[in-house]
UniProtKB/Swiss-Prot annotation:
Physiological role: Catalytic subunit of a constitutively active serine/threonine-protein kinase complex that phosphorylates a large number of substrates containing acidic residues C-terminal to the phosphorylated serine or threonine. Phosphorylates YTA7 during S-phase to promote transcription of histones.
Top class in the EC scheme: transferase
InterPro entries assigned: CK2_alpha, Kinase-like_dom_sf, Prot_kinase_dom, Protein_kinase_ATP_BS, Ser/Thr_kinase_AS
This enzyme's EC code(s): 2.7.11.1
PANTHER family: CASEIN KINASE II SUBUNIT ALPHA
Family, as annotated: Belongs to the protein kinase superfamily. Ser/Thr protein kinase family. CK2 subfamily.
Organism expressing this protein natively: Saccharomyces cerevisiae (strain ATCC 204508 / S288c)
GO cellular component, one term: nucleoplasm
Location of the Protein kinase domain: 40-363
Family annotation (CDD domains): STKc_CK2_alpha
Pfam families: Pkinase (PF00069)
Protein name: Casein kinase II subunit alpha
Note from the entry: Present with 7180 molecules/cell in log phase SD medium.
GO molecular function: ATP binding; protein kinase activity; protein serine kinase activity; protein serine/threonine kinase activity
Length: 372
Protein backbone atom coordinates (compact mmCIF):
# COMPACT_ATOMS: atom_id res chain seq x y z
CA UNK A 1 0.00 0.00 0.00
CA UNK A 2 1.32 3.42 -0.96
CA UNK A 3 1.30 5.74 2.06
CA UNK A 4 -1.15 8.58 1.45
CA UNK A 5 -0.43 10.40 4.70
CA UNK A 6 3.21 10.92 5.53
CA UNK A 7 4.57 10.52 9.01
CA UNK A 8 7.97 11.16 10.56
CA UNK A 9 9.63 10.22 13.83
CA UNK A 10 9.08 12.60 16.75
CA UNK A 11 12.70 12.18 17.87
CA UNK A 12 16.06 11.60 16.15
CA UNK A 13 14.30 12.52 12.92
CA UNK A 14 17.26 13.65 10.83
CA UNK A 15 20.13 11.74 12.43
CA UNK A 16 21.15 10.02 9.20
CA UNK A 17 20.73 13.19 7.17
CA UNK A 18 23.29 14.81 9.48
CA UNK A 19 25.76 11.96 8.99
CA UNK A 20 27.98 11.30 6.02
CA UNK A 21 26.66 8.76 3.55
CA UNK A 22 29.34 6.25 4.57
CA UNK A 23 27.62 5.89 7.94
CA UNK A 24 24.38 4.39 6.58
CA UNK A 25 25.15 3.30 3.00
CA UNK A 26 25.56 -0.42 3.66
CA UNK A 27 24.98 -1.42 0.03
CA UNK A 28 28.30 0.12 -1.01
CA UNK A 29 30.17 -1.01 2.07
CA UNK A 30 33.11 -3.37 1.59
CA UNK A 31 33.34 -6.11 4.22
CA UNK A 32 36.83 -7.16 5.25
CA UNK A 33 36.19 -10.80 6.15
CA UNK A 34 38.68 -12.66 8.30
CA UNK A 35 39.51 -16.22 7.25
CA UNK A 36 41.11 -17.16 10.57
CA UNK A 37 38.42 -19.66 11.48
CA UNK A 38 40.99 -21.69 13.41
CA UNK A 39 40.96 -18.98 16.09
CA UNK A 40 37.62 -20.34 17.28
CA UNK A 41 36.18 -23.68 18.28
CA UNK A 42 32.49 -24.54 18.18
CA UNK A 43 31.25 -26.42 21.25
CA UNK A 44 27.49 -26.81 20.87
CA UNK A 45 24.46 -25.51 19.03
CA UNK A 46 22.31 -23.13 21.06
CA UNK A 47 19.69 -21.96 18.60
CA UNK A 48 18.50 -21.48 15.06
CA UNK A 49 16.38 -19.01 13.19
CA UNK A 50 15.11 -18.24 9.72
CA UNK A 51 18.38 -16.64 8.67
CA UNK A 52 21.03 -18.25 10.87
CA UNK A 53 22.22 -21.00 13.18
CA UNK A 54 23.80 -20.07 16.50
CA UNK A 55 26.57 -21.91 18.33
CA UNK A 56 28.39 -21.49 21.60
CA UNK A 57 32.14 -21.63 21.26
CA UNK A 58 35.46 -20.49 22.59
CA UNK A 59 38.33 -18.32 21.39
CA UNK A 60 41.20 -20.77 21.57
CA UNK A 61 44.06 -18.49 22.62
CA UNK A 62 42.22 -16.91 25.56
CA UNK A 63 39.53 -19.53 26.30
CA UNK A 64 36.97 -16.71 26.28
CA UNK A 65 33.42 -17.94 25.67
CA UNK A 66 31.84 -16.63 22.49
CA UNK A 67 28.73 -17.03 20.35
CA UNK A 68 29.07 -17.75 16.64
CA UNK A 69 26.16 -16.85 14.39
CA UNK A 70 26.50 -18.74 11.09
CA UNK A 71 24.47 -17.03 8.39
CA UNK A 72 22.29 -19.00 6.01
CA UNK A 73 22.30 -18.09 2.30
CA UNK A 74 20.59 -14.71 2.07
CA UNK A 75 21.00 -11.59 -0.03
CA UNK A 76 24.42 -10.01 0.43
CA UNK A 77 22.68 -6.69 1.07
CA UNK A 78 21.02 -8.09 4.20
CA UNK A 79 24.33 -9.39 5.56
CA UNK A 80 26.01 -6.06 4.83
CA UNK A 81 23.22 -4.19 6.59
CA UNK A 82 23.49 -6.23 9.78
CA UNK A 83 27.28 -5.90 9.92
CA UNK A 84 27.19 -2.18 9.14
CA UNK A 85 24.64 -1.53 11.87
CA UNK A 86 26.52 -3.61 14.44
CA UNK A 87 29.81 -1.90 13.69
CA UNK A 88 28.21 1.55 13.74
CA UNK A 89 26.70 0.75 17.14
CA UNK A 90 30.02 -0.59 18.40
CA UNK A 91 32.28 2.17 17.10
CA UNK A 92 30.41 5.15 18.51
CA UNK A 93 31.89 6.65 21.66
CA UNK A 94 29.18 6.98 24.29
CA UNK A 95 29.36 10.07 26.51
CA UNK A 96 29.28 9.63 30.30
CA UNK A 97 25.87 8.48 31.48
CA UNK A 98 23.34 11.20 32.22
CA UNK A 99 19.92 10.61 33.67
CA UNK A 100 17.18 10.21 31.04
CA UNK A 101 14.86 12.77 32.57
CA UNK A 102 17.35 15.61 32.17
CA UNK A 103 16.69 18.07 29.37
CA UNK A 104 20.03 17.42 27.67
CA UNK A 105 20.19 14.75 25.01
CA UNK A 106 21.01 11.34 26.49
CA UNK A 107 23.49 10.68 23.70
CA UNK A 108 24.73 13.64 21.69
CA UNK A 109 28.12 12.64 20.35
CA UNK A 110 28.31 12.50 16.57
CA UNK A 111 31.00 10.70 14.59
CA UNK A 112 31.45 11.60 10.94
CA UNK A 113 34.65 9.74 10.05
CA UNK A 114 33.10 6.29 9.74
CA UNK A 115 35.19 4.10 7.46
CA UNK A 116 33.54 2.57 4.44
CA UNK A 117 35.86 -0.44 4.72
CA UNK A 118 34.49 -2.41 7.64
CA UNK A 119 36.47 -4.38 10.19
CA UNK A 120 34.96 -4.64 13.67
CA UNK A 121 37.02 -4.26 16.80
CA UNK A 122 38.59 -7.50 18.01
CA UNK A 123 38.98 -8.86 21.54
CA UNK A 124 41.90 -6.74 22.69
CA UNK A 125 40.40 -3.44 21.53
CA UNK A 126 38.05 -1.25 23.61
CA UNK A 127 34.32 -1.36 22.92
CA UNK A 128 32.97 2.16 22.46
CA UNK A 129 29.30 1.34 21.94
CA UNK A 130 26.49 1.03 24.45
CA UNK A 131 26.94 -1.68 27.07
CA UNK A 132 23.44 -3.08 26.50
CA UNK A 133 23.97 -3.70 22.78
CA UNK A 134 25.47 -7.11 22.03
CA UNK A 135 29.18 -6.76 21.29
CA UNK A 136 30.36 -7.87 17.84
CA UNK A 137 33.87 -9.30 18.12
CA UNK A 138 34.72 -10.54 14.64
CA UNK A 139 33.39 -11.29 11.16
CA UNK A 140 34.73 -14.44 9.59
CA UNK A 141 34.22 -16.49 6.46
CA UNK A 142 35.27 -20.09 6.01
CA UNK A 143 37.88 -20.09 3.21
CA UNK A 144 36.52 -23.33 1.74
CA UNK A 145 32.73 -23.27 2.20
CA UNK A 146 32.57 -19.43 2.07
CA UNK A 147 30.02 -19.57 4.91
CA UNK A 148 29.92 -16.18 6.66
CA UNK A 149 29.70 -15.96 10.43
CA UNK A 150 29.54 -13.27 13.09
CA UNK A 151 31.35 -13.70 16.40
CA UNK A 152 29.72 -12.15 19.47
CA UNK A 153 30.30 -11.89 23.17
CA UNK A 154 28.78 -14.70 25.23
CA UNK A 155 25.94 -13.92 27.62
CA UNK A 156 24.94 -16.50 30.24
CA UNK A 157 21.28 -16.08 29.41
CA UNK A 158 18.37 -17.51 31.37
CA UNK A 159 15.41 -18.47 29.17
CA UNK A 160 12.72 -15.82 29.53
CA UNK A 161 10.01 -18.44 30.10
CA UNK A 162 11.86 -19.50 33.24
CA UNK A 163 13.20 -16.10 34.32
CA UNK A 164 10.30 -13.69 33.80
CA UNK A 165 7.78 -15.43 36.11
CA UNK A 166 10.36 -15.30 38.93
CA UNK A 167 11.30 -11.63 38.62
CA UNK A 168 10.32 -9.24 41.38
CA UNK A 169 8.62 -5.93 40.69
CA UNK A 170 11.91 -4.05 41.10
CA UNK A 171 13.81 -6.49 38.88
CA UNK A 172 11.28 -6.04 36.06
CA UNK A 173 11.68 -2.28 36.35
CA UNK A 174 15.47 -2.61 36.27
CA UNK A 175 15.67 -4.86 33.21
CA UNK A 176 13.06 -2.96 31.24
CA UNK A 177 14.89 0.28 32.02
CA UNK A 178 18.09 -1.33 30.71
CA UNK A 179 16.26 -2.36 27.54
CA UNK A 180 14.98 1.20 27.08
CA UNK A 181 18.55 2.48 27.37
CA UNK A 182 19.56 0.16 24.53
CA UNK A 183 16.61 1.28 22.41
CA UNK A 184 17.21 4.97 23.04
CA UNK A 185 20.85 4.50 22.09
CA UNK A 186 20.17 2.73 18.78
CA UNK A 187 17.41 5.23 17.96
CA UNK A 188 19.79 8.10 18.70
CA UNK A 189 22.10 6.46 16.16
CA UNK A 190 19.34 6.53 13.53
CA UNK A 191 18.64 2.80 13.76
CA UNK A 192 15.38 0.87 14.26
CA UNK A 193 15.76 -2.65 15.69
CA UNK A 194 12.44 -3.94 14.26
CA UNK A 195 12.50 -7.28 16.11
CA UNK A 196 12.24 -6.50 19.81
CA UNK A 197 10.98 -9.56 21.70
CA UNK A 198 12.02 -11.64 24.72
CA UNK A 199 13.97 -14.06 22.51
CA UNK A 200 16.25 -11.17 21.48
CA UNK A 201 16.84 -9.83 24.98
CA UNK A 202 19.60 -11.80 26.68
CA UNK A 203 19.70 -11.53 30.47
CA UNK A 204 22.53 -12.78 32.66
CA UNK A 205 20.52 -12.62 35.87
CA UNK A 206 23.43 -13.52 38.13
CA UNK A 207 25.40 -10.49 36.98
CA UNK A 208 22.36 -8.29 36.25
CA UNK A 209 23.48 -7.89 32.64
CA UNK A 210 21.18 -7.31 29.65
CA UNK A 211 22.02 -7.38 25.95
CA UNK A 212 19.78 -6.60 22.97
CA UNK A 213 20.71 -9.06 20.23
CA UNK A 214 19.84 -10.10 16.67
CA UNK A 215 20.13 -7.03 14.48
CA UNK A 216 19.35 -8.93 11.29
CA UNK A 217 16.10 -7.02 10.70
CA UNK A 218 17.40 -3.65 11.91
CA UNK A 219 17.38 -0.72 9.49
CA UNK A 220 18.56 2.88 9.25
CA UNK A 221 15.76 5.40 9.64
CA UNK A 222 15.31 8.02 6.90
CA UNK A 223 12.50 10.56 6.83
CA UNK A 224 9.77 9.92 4.24
CA UNK A 225 11.05 6.45 3.42
CA UNK A 226 8.62 3.54 3.14
CA UNK A 227 9.78 0.32 4.77
CA UNK A 228 9.01 -3.36 4.46
CA UNK A 229 6.22 -4.39 6.84
CA UNK A 230 7.40 -8.01 6.93
CA UNK A 231 9.51 -7.43 10.02
CA UNK A 232 9.14 -8.25 13.74
CA UNK A 233 7.66 -11.46 15.08
CA UNK A 234 3.89 -11.83 14.92
CA UNK A 235 3.09 -11.40 18.62
CA UNK A 236 5.15 -8.19 18.74
CA UNK A 237 4.13 -6.57 15.45
CA UNK A 238 2.80 -3.04 15.77
CA UNK A 239 -0.58 -2.18 14.20
CA UNK A 240 1.20 -0.21 11.47
CA UNK A 241 2.75 -3.42 10.15
CA UNK A 242 -0.54 -5.30 10.27
CA UNK A 243 -2.40 -2.64 8.26
CA UNK A 244 0.48 -2.26 5.77
CA UNK A 245 1.43 1.29 6.77
CA UNK A 246 5.02 1.56 5.55
CA UNK A 247 6.13 4.96 6.78
CA UNK A 248 6.82 3.77 10.31
CA UNK A 249 9.73 4.76 12.55
CA UNK A 250 11.47 4.05 15.87
CA UNK A 251 8.08 3.94 17.62
CA UNK A 252 7.59 0.44 16.20
CA UNK A 253 10.18 -0.75 18.75
CA UNK A 254 8.19 0.88 21.55
CA UNK A 255 5.07 -1.07 20.63
CA UNK A 256 7.08 -4.30 20.82
CA UNK A 257 8.58 -3.14 24.11
CA UNK A 258 5.07 -2.38 25.40
CA UNK A 259 3.79 -5.85 24.54
CA UNK A 260 6.78 -7.37 26.37
CA UNK A 261 6.10 -5.21 29.41
CA UNK A 262 2.37 -6.00 29.44
CA UNK A 263 3.17 -9.70 29.21
CA UNK A 264 5.54 -9.52 32.18
CA UNK A 265 3.20 -7.43 34.33
CA UNK A 266 -0.04 -9.28 33.61
CA UNK A 267 1.69 -12.69 33.40
CA UNK A 268 0.13 -13.36 30.03
CA UNK A 269 2.59 -14.76 27.48
CA UNK A 270 2.30 -13.51 24.81
CA UNK A 271 0.01 -10.60 25.58
CA UNK A 272 -1.56 -10.49 22.09
CA UNK A 273 -1.75 -14.10 20.88
CA UNK A 274 -2.85 -14.13 17.26
CA UNK A 275 -2.83 -17.29 15.14
CA UNK A 276 -2.01 -15.31 11.97
CA UNK A 277 -1.19 -11.72 11.07
CA UNK A 278 -4.88 -11.11 10.40
CA UNK A 279 -5.89 -12.62 13.73
CA UNK A 280 -3.09 -10.70 15.47
CA UNK A 281 -4.70 -7.40 14.50
CA UNK A 282 -8.09 -8.68 15.66
CA UNK A 283 -6.58 -9.61 19.04
CA UNK A 284 -5.22 -6.06 19.38
CA UNK A 285 -8.54 -4.45 18.42
CA UNK A 286 -10.36 -6.63 20.94
CA UNK A 287 -8.29 -4.95 23.67
CA UNK A 288 -7.82 -1.39 22.39
CA UNK A 289 -11.26 -1.14 20.82
CA UNK A 290 -12.72 -0.41 17.40
CA UNK A 291 -13.39 3.30 17.96
CA UNK A 292 -9.74 4.33 18.36
CA UNK A 293 -8.76 1.93 15.59
CA UNK A 294 -11.10 3.64 13.14
CA UNK A 295 -9.75 7.06 14.17
CA UNK A 296 -6.23 5.79 13.46
CA UNK A 297 -7.21 4.49 10.03
CA UNK A 298 -8.92 7.77 9.19
CA UNK A 299 -5.98 9.92 10.32
CA UNK A 300 -3.52 8.10 8.06
CA UNK A 301 -6.06 7.34 5.30
CA UNK A 302 -5.43 3.62 5.61
CA UNK A 303 -7.67 1.24 3.69
CA UNK A 304 -7.94 -2.14 5.35
CA UNK A 305 -7.33 -5.27 3.29
CA UNK A 306 -10.44 -7.21 2.29
CA UNK A 307 -9.98 -9.88 4.98
CA UNK A 308 -10.83 -7.28 7.65
CA UNK A 309 -14.09 -6.08 6.08
CA UNK A 310 -16.26 -8.22 8.35
CA UNK A 311 -14.36 -7.47 11.56
CA UNK A 312 -16.69 -7.17 14.54
CA UNK A 313 -17.05 -4.02 16.64
CA UNK A 314 -15.24 -4.14 19.98
CA UNK A 315 -15.44 -1.88 23.02
CA UNK A 316 -12.09 -0.90 24.49
CA UNK A 317 -11.16 -3.20 27.38
CA UNK A 318 -9.99 -1.37 30.54
CA UNK A 319 -6.49 -2.39 31.63
CA UNK A 320 -7.69 -3.27 35.13
CA UNK A 321 -9.61 -6.17 33.56
CA UNK A 322 -6.26 -7.95 33.19
CA UNK A 323 -5.42 -7.66 36.89
CA UNK A 324 -5.94 -10.85 38.90
CA UNK A 325 -4.70 -12.53 42.06
CA UNK A 326 -1.71 -13.96 40.23
CA UNK A 327 -0.37 -10.61 39.00
CA UNK A 328 -1.77 -7.89 41.25
CA UNK A 329 1.54 -7.60 43.13
CA UNK A 330 2.96 -6.29 39.83
CA UNK A 331 -0.04 -4.70 38.14
CA UNK A 332 -1.90 -3.21 41.07
CA UNK A 333 -0.69 0.37 40.77
CA UNK A 334 -1.75 3.23 38.53
CA UNK A 335 1.78 4.02 37.33
CA UNK A 336 2.40 0.75 35.48
CA UNK A 337 -1.09 0.86 33.96
CA UNK A 338 -0.40 4.39 32.73
CA UNK A 339 2.95 3.38 31.24
CA UNK A 340 1.49 0.41 29.37
CA UNK A 341 -1.41 2.56 28.17
CA UNK A 342 0.99 5.15 26.73
CA UNK A 343 3.04 2.52 24.91
CA UNK A 344 0.28 0.38 23.43
CA UNK A 345 -1.31 2.99 21.19
CA UNK A 346 -2.54 2.41 17.64
CA UNK A 347 -1.12 5.74 16.54
CA UNK A 348 2.67 5.47 16.52
CA UNK A 349 2.90 9.24 16.96
CA UNK A 350 1.17 8.94 20.35
CA UNK A 351 3.48 6.31 21.83
CA UNK A 352 6.12 7.29 24.34
CA UNK A 353 9.65 7.44 22.99
CA UNK A 354 12.31 5.36 24.75
CA UNK A 355 13.62 8.44 26.53
CA UNK A 356 10.13 9.53 27.58
CA UNK A 357 9.42 6.05 28.91
CA UNK A 358 12.61 6.14 30.99
CA UNK A 359 11.35 9.35 32.55
CA UNK A 360 8.01 7.78 33.53
CA UNK A 361 7.16 7.71 37.28
CA UNK A 362 7.11 3.89 37.27
CA UNK A 363 10.89 3.92 36.76
CA UNK A 364 11.52 6.39 39.61
CA UNK A 365 13.05 3.71 41.91
CA UNK A 366 15.57 2.84 39.18
CA UNK A 367 16.47 6.46 38.53
CA UNK A 368 16.96 6.97 42.27
CA UNK A 369 19.44 4.08 42.30
CA UNK A 370 21.37 5.71 39.45
CA UNK A 371 21.52 9.00 41.34
CA UNK A 372 23.08 7.24 44.32
Amino acid sequence: MKCRVWSEARVYTNINKQRTEEYWDYENTVIDWSTNTKDYEIENKVGRGKYSEVFQGVKLDSKVKIVIKMLKPVKKKKIKREIKILTDLSNEKVPPTTLPFQKDQYYTNQKEDVLKFIRPYIFDQPHNGHANIIHLFDIIKDPISKTPALVFEYVDNVDFRILYPKLTDLEIRFYMFELLKALDYCHSMGIMHRDVKPHNVMIDHKNKKLRLIDWGLAEFYHVNMEYNVRVASRFFKGPELLVDYRMYDYSLDLWSFGTMLASMIFKREPFFHGTSNTDQLVKIVKVLGTSDFEKYLLKYEITLPREFYDMDQYIRKPWHRFINDGNKHLSGNDEIIDLIDNLLRYDHQERLTAKEAMGHPWFAPIREQIEK
